[in-house]
Amino acid sequence: MQFSKMHGLGNDFMVVDAVTQNVFFSPELIRRLADRHLGVGFDQLLVVEPPYDPELDFHYRIFNADGSEVAQCGNGARCFARFVRLKGLTNKRDIRVSTANGRMVLTVTDDDLVRVNMGEPNFEPSAVPFRANKAEKTYIMRAAEQTILCGVVSMGNPHCVIQVDDVDTAAVETLGPVLESHERFPERANIGFMQVVKREHIRLRVYERGAGETQACGSGACAAVAVGIQQGLLDEEVRVELPGGRLDIAWKGPGHPLYMTGPAVHVYDGFIHL
């Protein structure tokens, strides 16, 4: 099986063309491939499939390193767009794809950045899903013997965003896994720790569902900005500084899609016998 290794700000992926290759990934195989000592090593596996709808170009599938399939990965979406052009699967700059729970438009810019229409953030608890009686801008949660104030949003996948004074000292390693599997998130969640530097600049660390802390989380950056705007903390255009680098997020508010712009890097091509 041929594959490519790619990354978006250090969030790394194994990307496989299932348009011209016949492939099947069991959870066990994915876990073996994800092992950084015995396999290829990655945060997520991205699979390019033929479209299910003639109006679309491809179907986009995402698997975490633990073998679980998820519906969204923003950094992966940028790498997906770069991959299909590099491999000659399309020469379009506007690439329309379906995911497990919707559709996306990926735009490759002239300077090889990728702009992703991530859709409109959904704050309804049932959409996340999150157990709550009604939608609130801020929720109170109990976790690890602490009272946590957080915002909750779906970007096609579940996110919880906590504001912290300093991301460098935030309890990502301890609080992240506790909140990820909190009973109020029946499908688990990605946990973002957000430091507001200015109204147009945040710092962010994300503990990803099924992957742990990563160098960058695209949908997590989108979620943090959406929650920050909803809570009145941020402007419509925000620079997000992650451990792996920078993303630019723009959202005009309810009724509008959110846009993420950032790099996608091709590292190498490989071949593996399964």
From Swiss-Prot:
Q: What is its main location?
A: cytoplasm
| Binding residue positions for substrate | N11, Q44, N64, G74, N75, N157, N190, E208, R209, G218, S219
| Annotated EC | 5.1.1.7
Q: Which reaction does it catalyse?
A: (2S,6S)-2,6-diaminopimelate = meso-2,6-diaminopimelate
Q: Which Gene3D superfamilies match?
A: Diaminopimelate Epimerase, Chain A, domain 1 (3.10.310.10)
Give any Gene Ontology cellular component: cytosol
Query: Which PROSITE patterns did the record assign?
Result: DAP_EPIMERASE (PS01326)
* Signal peptide span: none
Q: Which domain of life is it from?
A: Bacteria
This protein's record includes keyword Transmembrane helix: no
Q: Where is this site: Important for dimerization?
A: Y268
Give the record's keywords alphabetically: Amino-acid biosynthesis, Cytoplasm, Isomerase, Lysine biosynthesis
Which subcellular locations apply to this protein?
Cytoplasm
- Active site positions: C73 (proton donor), C217 (proton acceptor)
Q: Which GO terms describe its molecular function?
A: diaminopimelate epimerase activity
GO biological-process terms attached to the record? lysine biosynthetic process via diaminopimelate
Instruction: Site Could be important to modulate the pK values of the two catalytic cysteine residues: give positions.
Output: H159, E208
Note the NCBIfam families from the entry: DapF (TIGR00652)
PANTHER family noted in UniProt: DIAMINOPIMELATE EPIMERASE (PTHR31689:SF0), DIAMINOPIMELATE EPIMERASE, CHLOROPLASTIC (PTHR31689)
Assembly with partners or alone: Homodimer.
Q: What family is reported?
A: Belongs to the diaminopimelate epimerase family.
As for what it does, the entry says:
Catalyzes the stereoinversion of LL-2,6-diaminopimelate (L,L-DAP) to meso-diaminopimelate (meso-DAP), a precursor of L-lysine and an essential component of the bacterial peptidoglycan.
What is the name of this protein? Answer: Diaminopimelate epimerase
Q: Which organism is it from?
A: Shigella flexneri serotype 5b (strain 8401)
